[in-house]
UniProtKB/Swiss-Prot annotation:
Members of the RBR family are atypical E3 ligases. They interact with the E2 conjugating enzyme UBE2L3 and function like HECT-type E3 enzymes: they bind E2s via the first RING domain, but require an obligate trans-thiolation step during the ubiquitin transfer, requiring a conserved cysteine residue in the second RING domain. It is an enzyme of class 2 (transferase). PANTHER family: RBR FAMILY RING FINGER AND IBR DOMAIN-CONTAINING. The keyword DNA repair does not apply. This is Probable E3 ubiquitin-protein ligase RNF144A-A. It comes from Danio rerio (Zebrafish). A zinc finger (IBR-type) spans 91-156. A zinc finger (RING-type) spans 20-70, 186-215. Zn(2+) 3 binds at C143, C146, H151, C156. Keywords: Membrane, Metal-binding, Repeat, Transferase, Transmembrane, Transmembrane helix, Ubl conjugation pathway, Zinc, Zinc-finger. One of its GO terms (cellular component) is membrane. The keyword Transmembrane helix applies. Its main location: membrane.
């Protein structure tokens, strides 16, 4: 049986509590973590949950200070992140870092084969022009620009849908997988996306493009997810009918609330417009008056 340790009053006075900007709670200094780059202080539990969420969702590799008003706009260093998270989460963080490095490096590209996913090196002198790339792992030969099979003396076919280069399609270098292939490419920016489980409505972390995982059709304007009510993707969203109805109710409610707010505010806007215009005209007239000599 454990008992609470008695601490004298003067000891408590010398151990002040520090406020966390995330949860607004107050904790002793030993339960707080200071970000080295900006010296902002948060409770260790909140900062740990914040870092883990960003890594699990894959939002960003440069994890910034959670304080939006941070004057130095600091970032957490890799050793600080490693002290907070579990080994498997840290491995995912390093994987995301590597993927971003390859994406931003013009001299490297990913092998387009869904069964390979190796990193291929381009010739440094011709990184801008389409060139033949040969994967050192699977020996696949493809075009560095369009990722299709190498086409010497032919231009890249810009009008060919990107879906023809994706797993599950009739491409010369992709295995004929089913619609549940774990890795596909964004139809807009061609970045590789891995889907573990969950909803079929995907959003590319690179270009923020929303699309259906199965048919790759754009969902940017489909706020009500009508796409999953018909066609080959019907009932493939991955959520129950009740949750879909609740989502649509929320979306309709938001639009209805915005419309109602605009309707209520419109008379006040109409009344205020003449006064605003008069004030602006008066100010501009005052600026045009010559200065007294």
């Amino acid at each position: 049986m454990t008992t609470a340790r008695y601490r004298p009053t003067w000891d408590l006075a010398l151990d002040p509590l520090v406020s966390c900007k995330l949860c607004l709670g107050e904790f002793p200094l030993e339960q707080m973590t200071t970000i080295t780059q900006c010296q902002c202080v948060f409770c260790t539990m909140c900062l740990k949950q914040y870092v883990e969420l960003l890594i699990k969702e894959g939002f960003e590799t440069a994890i910034s200070c959670p304080d939006s008003a941070c004057p130095k706009r600091g970032h957490l260093q890799e050793n600080e992140i490693e002290c907070m998270v579990a080994t498997e989460i840290m491995q995912r963080y390093r994987k995301l870092q590597f993927e971003k490095e390859v994406l931003l490096d013009p001299s490297r590209t990913w092998c387009p084969s869904s069964t390979c996913q190796a990193v291929c090196q381009l010739k440094e002198s011709d990184t801008v022009l389409p060139q033949l790339v040969r994967c050192s792992v699977c020996t696949l030969e493809f075009c560095s620009a369009c990722k299709a099979s190498w086409h010497p003396d032919q231009d890249c076919q810009e009008n060919v849908p990107i879906t023809s280069f994706l797993p599950g399609e009739s491409s010369s270098f992709f295995k004929a997988d089913d619609d549940d292939a774990p890795i596909k490419r964004c139809p807009k920016c061609k970045v590789y996306i891995e889907r573990d489980e969950g909803c079929a409505q995907m959003m590319c972390k690179n270009c923020k493009h929303a699309f259906c995982w199965y048919c790759l059709e754009s969902l940017d304007d489909d706020f009500l997810l009508i796409h999953y009510d018909k066609g080959p993707c019907r009932n493939k969203l991955g959520h129950s009918r009740a949750s879909v109805i609740w989502h649509r109710t929320q979306v309709v409610g938001i639009f209805a609330g915005f419309g109602l707010l605009l309707l209520v505010a419109s008379p006040f806007l109409l009344l205020a417009t003449p006064f605003v215009l008069c004030c602006k005209c008066k100010c501009s007239k005052g600026d045009d008056d010559p200065l007294p000599t």
